[in-house]
């Protein structure tokens, strides 16, 4: 990934960053190991088949973590920090789904070098699986 240099003053409403990834079986297992979330819906196919989902689904936070990539891509260099992130999980994500995460600037708050952003994650069918809002603070040059 490339993180281009971008000054705070160069941001405009509508600026966006995108990252896409296909969710794999290994992603679920690695995320379960790293996060400690070993809930059977994510790691046990036999159990997951008995649920309303019919198969294992990705952890919500695994899918949401793609927004960390888009937030960083949007900020560029010098970077910044995420101050807040709200999320609504709208649809399940299955192994094999290809997700597209987007962070888009909706408001510029110059007094504290902050950006209010809309964040979305959609699947390969164009269905919105996560929506939310991020508050990012850009570092000075």
Show where each model-derived region lies.
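HotDog/MaoC-like acyl-thioester-processing domains
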Residues: 2-13, 92-141
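Hydrophobic beta-strand-centered segment that forms part of the acyl-chain substrate-binding groove
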Residues: 49-58, 62-105
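Catalytic strand-loop segment that frames the active site of acyl-thioester-processing enzymes
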Residues: 1-58, 140-141
């Amino acid at each position: 990934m490339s993180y281009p240099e971008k000054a705070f003053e160069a941001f405009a409403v509508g600026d966006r960053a995108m990252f896409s990834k296909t969710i794999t079986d290994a992603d679920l297992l690695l995320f379960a190991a790293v996060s400690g979330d070993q809930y059977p819906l994510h790691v046990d196919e036999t159990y997951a088949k008995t649920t309303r989902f019919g198969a294992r689904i990705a952890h919500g936070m695994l899918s949401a973590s793609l927004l960390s990539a888009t937030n960083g891509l949007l900020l560029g260099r010098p970077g910044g920090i995420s101050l807040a992130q709200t999320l609504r999980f709208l649809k399940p994500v299955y192994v094999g789904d290809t997700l597209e995460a987007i962070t888009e600037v909706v408001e510029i708050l110059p007094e504290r070098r902050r950006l209010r952003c809309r964040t979305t994650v959609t699947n390969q069918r164009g269905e919105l699986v996560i929506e939310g809002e991020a508050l990012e603070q850009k570092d000075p040059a």
